[in-house]
UniProtKB/Swiss-Prot annotation:
Catalytic residues (UniProt): 36 (proton acceptor), 47 (proton acceptor)
MF (Gene Ontology): tryptophan synthase activity
The protein's annotated pathway: Amino-acid biosynthesis; L-tryptophan biosynthesis; L-tryptophan from chorismate: step 5/5
Any one Pfam family match given in the protein's UniProt record, by short name: Trp_syntA
Protein family per UniProt: Belongs to the TrpA family.
The protein's name: Tryptophan synthase alpha chain
Lineage, broadest ranks: Archaea, Methanobacteriati, Methanobacteriota, Thermococci, Thermococcales
Organism name: Thermococcus kodakarensis (strain ATCC BAA-918 / JCM 12380 / KOD1) (Pyrococcus kodakaraensis (strain KOD1))
InterPro entries according to UniProt: Aldolase_TIM (IPR013785), RibuloseP-bd_barrel (IPR011060), Trp_synthase_alpha_AS (IPR018204), Trp_synthase_suA (IPR002028)
Length: 251
């Protein structure tokens, strides 16, 4: 789904609007191996304060699930950069698994990550994703045992998403040593590519994770925070993603 050494920017759909999200996607796609587009949800339990607030801003402005697909369809008119949708299971269940995945595929999504769907309960989801030709991505935490990590790797057809730390999303000044130990352990077990997320906000952190064996690194909260406080978010977002990707010298 992405080249080794890729940066994977995360953006929340509809924060602060449909039109701005499309501008943000187009600003980062040049430097992204893959884009993760989050669907706003009222109880984003895996996310920290920064991304929670982005979900609430979008929902408060009247953002609906169908708006996510509308953004993606418009983005596909301009870019072929792979996109995975990140969501919680409630919107998938309420829509219907087959209908949700069918609309995701039709709008141009390449894969789906359902944060709170464990592999052991993902049978219907996996069958529907395979039928639609969508890649699946599952999360693994630093304390995930080896045997369960093998199950997660087997169920993932896109990549395995390694959580770098214990806790929720949110930029950290330093990543714990357990993050790098986890990457090295997963590298020995998983056949899929590995992307690491949660807590990453700096280029040196991206480089350290890639050096430890990650194929891609996800950055979310640092970008969402930039968007929320900037007077020129499109240009600042582009520069930040370029810097995180290692392309800053080319600007």
């Amino acid at each position: 789904m992405f080249e080794k050494g890729s940066l994977i920017p995360y953006l929340t759909a509809g924060d602060p609007s449909v039109e701005k999200t499309l501008e943000f996607l187009l600003a980062v796609e040049e430097f992204a191996g893959l884009i993760e587009l989050g669907i706003p949800f009222s109880d984003p339990m895996a996310d920290g304060k920064t991304i929670q607030e982005s979900h609430y801003r979008a929902l408060r402005n009247g953002f609906k699930l169908d708006d996510t697909f509308r953004i993606l369809r418009e983005f596909r008119r301009h870019s072929s950069t792979p996109v995975i949708l990140m969501t919680y299971y409630n919107p998938v269940f309420r829509t219907g698994v087959k209908k949700f995945l069918g609309e995701a595929k039709a709008s141009g999504a390449d894969g789906i990550l359902v944060v709170d769907l464990p592999v052991s309960h993902a049978g219907e989801f996996l069958d529907a994703a395979k039928e639609e030709g969508l890649k699946t991505v599952f999360l693994a935490a630093p304390n995930t045992p080896d045997e369960r990590l093998r199950e997660i790797d087997k169920a993932s057809t896109g990549f395995v998403y390694l959580i770098s730390l214990y806790g929720t999303t949110g930029a950290r000044d330093r990543l714990p040593e357990t993050a790098f130990e986890f990457v090295r352990r997963a590298r020995k077990i998983c056949n899929n590519k590995l992307a690491v997320g949660f807590g990453v906000s700096r280029r040196e952190q991206v480089e350290e994770l890639l050096k430890a064996g990650a194929d891609g690194v996800v950055v979310g909260s640092a970008l969402i925070e930039l968007i929320s406080r900037s007077e020129n978010p499109v240009e600042e977002l582009r520069r930040k993603v370029a810097e995180l990707s290692g392309y800053s010298r080319a600007l």
